Amino acid sequence: MSPQTETKASVGFKAGVKEYKLTYYTPEYETKDTDILAAFRVTPQPGVPPEEAGAAVAAESSTGTWTTVWTDGLTSLDRYKGRCYHIEPVPGETDQYICYVAYPLDLFEEGSVTNMFTSIVGNVFGFKALRALRLEDLRIPPAYIKTFQGPPHGIQVERDKLNKYGRPLLGCTIKPKLGLSAKNYGRAVYECLRGGLDFTKDDENVNSQPFMRWRDRFLFCAEAIYKSQAETGEIKGHYLNATAGTSEEMIKRAVFARELGVPIVMHDYLTGGFTANTSLAHYCRDNGLLLHIHRAMHAVIDRQKNHGIHFRVLAKALRMSGGDHIHSGTVVGKLEGERDITLGFVDLLRDDFIEKDRSRGIYFTQDWVSLPGVLPVASGGIHVWHMPALTEIFGDDSVLQFGGGTLGHPWGNAPGAVANRVALEACVKARNEGRDLASEGNVIIREAAKWSPELSAACEVWKEIRFDFKAVDTLDPEK
């Protein structure tokens, strides 16, 4: 460009590469109520200062690139850029830092978790200047939350639909997860529901395989639901997995479930994707269906302590995208989940206002401004001996799901369901009487087993089962 044709945008432009921290590290910045705030665990490459690493995260997840560009002069970077505004070392680690980044709200499309994640957890996670990067938490401002529908119905509406109050809901995943014919699958569902469970569930990888096509499964499960409801006088449900290879096919399956009159469908929200999940959540609200969410693939993303996305962020994203239930770990079962961390994101799922609490891994105060809550689902390696702990840890607003802990009963599915229902009712009754479930749990179960042969048999089968492994993802030590 000659001096005679120089444009206003190019005036003052100087080509080349400059340090990110000169533009994107702003420790004097005061965050706004409308900013999306992120807490990143940053592990820089040797020789990279934490200020440069934090600024690089802010830049590459917002307006920045590796070199200066003349089109910067066509917009206001101060208005749109992300800012690393605070950095603190991680206690007990020599090369890890928590970097706090503020993003202006105008960077994100309204009502789109997909767009939010594309920016905040996009290409920056492959940035060479960082050895590892993990998104620990997000503060979603009320102004952005109000652009989302959220869960199709929420906790209170679900209880009203089911007419079930004052206790956790009880579920079961049908096993074996793959290989059953549709008719045998429906029979297993019926036996569990008539035995006293509120829900049964498709496993996350049950979609529409050669051994059991989705339409056949839906029909036999609907028959099982209606037959068990007629026998027990209770409202029953089965999580019919609508997850499919295309969003159109997913919605078609949800439409068929609605036509059958069943109360709930299911989606694998991480493998299915946030766009598909939000579409399904909108359909479920419009058509009176509850939506159960499975988190298959989450551990690929969230299990490593120094790289990925913490599940509390995935849980917040799900509440925004939409779901009435989501699997949250058990604390006591076979799957990963430390107690304090798990209870932290359980509160983020259920409550309307959650204070910052680093002892539970919550980096920001979160106000959901009345967005409906999500029921946490405890599932994975649990059985009747775990019932007191689960009731005490998760409280009434939860779903406790016993797959092998129901279908593994020596007398069959229905007695397995009876054992779990008796154990749950005994724990709720004891808690309401003021007894301490943590210290008296085993006594409470043994007392109930005296008048329930089904529970007695279950207690005998699983009396030696333990999953005593330390969690991989743990809280940082205090300073």
From Swiss-Prot:
What remark does the entry make about the cofactor? Binds 1 Mg(2+) ion per subunit.
The site annotation (Transition state stabilizer) covers 334
Q: Where does substrate bind?
A: 123, 173, 177, 295, 327, 379
List the EC numbers from the record: 4.1.1.39
Give the top-rank taxon of the lineage listed in the UniProt record for this protein: Eukaryota
GO BP annotations of the record are:
photorespiration; reductive pentose-phosphate cycle
Q: Can you tell me which residues bind Mg(2+)? A: 201, 203-204
State the PROSITE patterns in the record.
RUBISCO_LARGE (PS00157)
Q: Which UniProt keywords apply?
A: Acetylation, Calvin cycle, Carbon dioxide fixation, Chloroplast, Lyase, Magnesium, Metal-binding, Methylation, Monooxygenase, Oxidoreductase, Photorespiration, Photosynthesis, Plastid
For the modification N6-carboxylysine, the affected residues are: 201
Sequence positions bearing N-acetylproline: 3
Catalytic activity, as annotated: 2 (2R)-3-phosphoglycerate + 2 H(+) = D-ribulose 1,5-bisphosphate + CO2 + H2O; D-ribulose 1,5-bisphosphate + O2 = 2-phosphoglycolate + (2R)-3-phosphoglycerate + 2 H(+)
Catalytic machinery residues: 175, 294
Q: Name one GO molecular function term.
A: magnesium ion binding
Give the required cofactors: Mg(2+)
Q: How does it assemble?
A: Heterohexadecamer of 8 large chains and 8 small chains.
Functional summary from the UniProt entry: RuBisCO catalyzes two reactions: the carboxylation of D-ribulose 1,5-bisphosphate, the primary event in carbon dioxide fixation, as well as the oxidative fragmentation of the pentose substrate in the photorespiration process. Both reactions occur simultaneously and in competition at the same active site.
Family affiliation = Belongs to the RuBisCO large chain family. Type I subfamily.
Q: What else is known?
A: The basic functional RuBisCO is composed of a large chain homodimer in a 'head-to-tail' conformation. In form I RuBisCO this homodimer is arranged in a barrel-like tetramer with the small subunits forming a tetrameric 'cap' on each end of the 'barrel'.
What is the name of the protein in this document?
Ribulose bisphosphate carboxylase large chain
